[in-house]
């Protein structure tokens, strides 16, 4: 938790400066370098125990797709996990298994329509709301979580399990390991915690079958792709893809209380209060600035648990907006935490919107990625029928 808080403070500095490091942060990172060295010794030793088979990795017959990263902070795991769900949910019985970060419960929990973000965590709650027909489960012990999913009745038992943020959970061996890295801060250019954001050394990327460089600009040039490809040093068995964020239509947080709107439909005079409690809010703010110059941003820590004091802070900022056309925009993850609070001001109901995001693949390789996923699942099921 100490490491997480140190890194969290660093990320606030990065986001507020569009990922530019300040002199203060650089000096701070240098002071933390010895701790990164010690942390690296521990992580390398743990990985060696798995490589030497002293710590046992569990293997399963059904397809298990892991979506993860080498760093703390936002690389886009949730939208990429949702992309895979959307691709395969009508073909197979799908389960998503997550740790359920910052939930108030413990152990294995299978989500249902009554589950809240406090029960299962922000991301699992968001996925269950979006895809009510799939199985969403949480358990910090992924092996136990998988055992519980496979113990379900045959007509409910998953044919495919997607592991959300489990790249470092080496007690489970995925059949397909997908590693994400932010285009603006590749893992090859980062440092170990707490001086940087790496959870483990760069050579951990060798466990990946697929590497996706995320959050690319739509105007990125072919030369940029080649530079990144050379920097990552792919192994022969690895495939490289590039993806970008796609922003959807604004959705009322309280259905029926506000009209549907689009970012493109915003008037240039519209005032927006952007409230975010995510790891990397800067790209979102940049996107909204394309449509209106009048953006006030309130940034909270990632996975922040909003309380009445936060509501008052947001309300004060909202009242300062003087335009007759004004709204509050939040992320889908923040909507999961705000929606059920009992103390929301009534006037927000007609002004509160969330901005959903999806991902698209660059260089016309979307179909190739889809075929890779489906072929992997079909081959695995054919060779290991459930």
Residue ranges of predicted features:
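A transmembrane-helix-recognition feature enriched in membrane-embedded lipid enzymes
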Residues: 14-62, 376, 384
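Residue-level signal for inorganic ion chemistry
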Residues: 38, 78, 127, 164, ...
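Single conserved hydrophobic/aromatic residue that forms the stacking wall/gate
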Residues: 1-15
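Acidic beta-strand-to-loop metal/phosphate-binding motif
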Residues: 326-333
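Short, flexible loop segments at boundaries between secondary-structure elements
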Residues: 246-248, 300-305, 347-379
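Walker A (P-loop) phosphate-binding motif
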Residues: 47-113, 218-219, 383-386
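Phosphate/Mg2+-binding loops and adjacent switch elements
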Residues: 100-103, 107-238, 242
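C-terminal accessory "lid"/substrate-recognition subdomains
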Residues: 16-25, 186-324, 383-386
């Amino acid at each position: 938790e100490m490491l997480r808080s140190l890194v969290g403070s660093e990320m606030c500095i990065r986001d507020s400066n569009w990922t530019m490091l300040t002199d203060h942060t650089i000096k701070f990172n240098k002071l933390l370098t010895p701790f990164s060295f010690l942390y690296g010794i521990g992580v390398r030793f743990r990985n060696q125990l798995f490589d030497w088979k002293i710590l046992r990795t569990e293997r399963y017959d059904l397809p298990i797709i892991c979506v993860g990263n080498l760093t703390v902070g936002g690389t886009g795991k949730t939208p990429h996990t949702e992309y895979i769900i959307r691709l395969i949910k009508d073909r197979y019985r799908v389960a998503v298994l997550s740790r359920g970060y910052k939930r108030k419960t413990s152990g294995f929990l299978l989500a249902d329509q009554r589950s809240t973000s406090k029960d299962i965590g922000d991301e699992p709650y968001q996925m269950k709301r979006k895809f009510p027909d799939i199985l969403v489960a949480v358990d910090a012990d992924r092996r136990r979580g998988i055992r519980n999913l496979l113990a379900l009745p045959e007509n409910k038992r998953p044919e495919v399990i997607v592991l959300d943020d489990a790249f470092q959970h080496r007690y489970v061996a995925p059949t397909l390991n997908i590693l994400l890295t932010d285009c603006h801060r590749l893992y090859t250019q980062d440092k170990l915690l707490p001086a940087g954001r790496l959870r483990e050394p760069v050579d951990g990327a060798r466990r990946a079958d697929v590497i996706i460089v995320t959050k690319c600009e739509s105007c990125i040039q072919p030369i940029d792709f080649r530079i990144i490809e050379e920097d990552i040093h792919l192994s022969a068995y690895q495939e490289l893809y590039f993806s970008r964020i796609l922003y959807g239509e604004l959705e009322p947080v309280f259905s029926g209380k506000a009209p549907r709107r689009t970012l493109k439909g915003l008037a240039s005079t519209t005032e927006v209060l952007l409230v975010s409690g995510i790891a990397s809010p800067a790209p979102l703010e940049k996107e909204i600035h394309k449509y209106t110059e009048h953006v006030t941003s309130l940034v909270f820590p990632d996975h922040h648990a909003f309380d009445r004091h936060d509501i008052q802070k947001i309300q004060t900022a909202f009242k300062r907006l003087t335009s007759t056309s004004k709204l509050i925009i939040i992320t889908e993850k923040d909507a999961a935490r705000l929606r059920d609070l009992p103390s929301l001001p009534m006037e927000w109901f007609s002004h509160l919107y969330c901005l959903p995001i999806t991902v698209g693949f660059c260089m016309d390789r979307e179909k190739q990625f889809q075929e890779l996923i489906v072929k992997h699942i079909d081959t695995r099921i054919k060779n290991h029928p459930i």
